């Protein structure tokens, strides 16, 4: 019966009128089912989940920690959350020795990096105490205590203590994760609650905890200029690749642009189709908010993959060692 139906459908595909009839009938069903699936994903959230990674290991997100992230992974797997950024980081996870996760949240990328590459050392910075507790639980749950160092501080251009602006959560068990240290932000304009957090310059942090940095991820809600300012010494020394979210802002992200330009880094837009060289350090396009800041560049405007950049960086490092 099933075989006969399959045969009939195959024949119908090759017939203009039958294919028109079947496609016209199927389109409303497809629309309804797609809308229903989207509605289910939005309304039915997964509080805690575990997924199998391609290398055979399991990655778990604990209950009451990153419910939105856990839900995305539950419904769509590894590429369910920030797929282009995730694929970019996974490329570098395979090759890097040290990864610094700035604005780690519940630790998705810290966990993924450590599980993706057993030799990778990870340092995760998350200043919000409630979110930080979830980060620690996730590290413990995935048995990564010895490989992921969790720091309950915010990276900044200054070391000390300052106000952190945390919008009210819309409900559920998630702690609102769009908080920021930026004083000129929508969070402040909307009367977000304030908590006091510890801040540290990454250059000072590495003086106390020596490391050579290969890869940095920054997701700090309009505070990336201060984070980059506080780690300029490490960036100039180690020339790591930096994956950074830069959202369109009224100030045009001019400080970020000047810092990146001063470090002699080349920004690339991270897109579904590949990596596009950013002309004139343009961080203002609303539909493109995730960037790869590269210490090297190739002549190509569009890159399908990152092998060329990595190999160019390796050659540059070898030349520096020979020069020394």
Regions found by a protein language model. Name each.
Residues 136, 140-171:
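Core alpha/beta nucleotide-donor-binding catalytic domains of modification enzymes
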Residues 104-106, 129, 155-157, 220-222, ...:
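Short, glycine/acidic-enriched loop or turn micro-motifs at the edges of active sites
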Residues 1-147, 187, 191, 209, ...:
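S-adenosyl-L-methionine
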Residues 126, 242-246:
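Short internal beta-strands
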Residues 76-100, 149, 161-163, 179-238, ...:
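Short internal loop-to-helix segment that lines adenine-nucleotide cofactor pockets
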Residues 200-206, 211-237, 243, 250-277, ...:
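Internal alpha/beta domain cores that form substrate/cofactor-binding pockets in large enzymes
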Residues 118-120, 238-241:
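A short helix->loop->beta-strand "cap" motif at the edges of active sites that frequently abuts
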């Amino acid at each position: 019966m099933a075989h006969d139906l399959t045969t009939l459908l195959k024949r119908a595909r090759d017939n203009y009128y039958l294919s028109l009839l079947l496609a016209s009938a199927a389109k409303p069903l497809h629309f309804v089912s797609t809308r229903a699936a989207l509605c289910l994903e939005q309304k039915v959230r997964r509080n805690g989940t575990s997924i199998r990674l391609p290398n055979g290991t399991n990655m778990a997100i604990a209950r009451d920690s990153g419910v939105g992230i856990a839900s995305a992974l539950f419904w769509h797997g590894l590429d369910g959350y920030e797929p282009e950024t995730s694929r970019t980081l996974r490329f570098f996870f395979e090759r890097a020795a040290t990864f610094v996760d700035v604005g780690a949240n519940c630790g998705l990328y810290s966990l993924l990096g450590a599980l993706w590459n057993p030799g990778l050392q990870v340092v995760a910075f998350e200043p919000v105490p409630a979110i930080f507790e979830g980060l620690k639980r996730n590290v413990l749950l995935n048995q990564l205590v010895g490989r992921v160092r969790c720091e309950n501080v915010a990276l900044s251009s200054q070391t000390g203590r300052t106000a952190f602006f945390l919008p009210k959560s819309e409900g559920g068990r998630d702690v609102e994760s769009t908080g920021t240290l930026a004083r000129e932000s929508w969070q402040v304009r909307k009367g977000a609650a304030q908590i006091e957090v510890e801040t540290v310059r990454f250059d000072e942090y590495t003086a106390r905890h020596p490391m050579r940095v290969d890869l940095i991820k920054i997701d700090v809600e309009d505070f990336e200029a201060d984070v980059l300012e506080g780690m300029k010494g490490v960036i100039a020394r180690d020339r790591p690749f930096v994956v950074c979210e830069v959202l369109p802002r009224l100030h045009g992200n001019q400080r970020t642009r000047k810092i990146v330009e001063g470090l002699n880094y080349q920004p690339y837009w991270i897109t579904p189709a590949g990596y596009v060289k950013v002309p004139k350090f343009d961080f203002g396009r609303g539909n493109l908010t995730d960037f790869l800041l590269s210490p090297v560049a190739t002549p190509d405007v569009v890159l399908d993959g990152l092998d060329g950049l990595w190999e160019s960086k390796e050659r540059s490092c070898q030349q520096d060692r020979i020069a020394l």
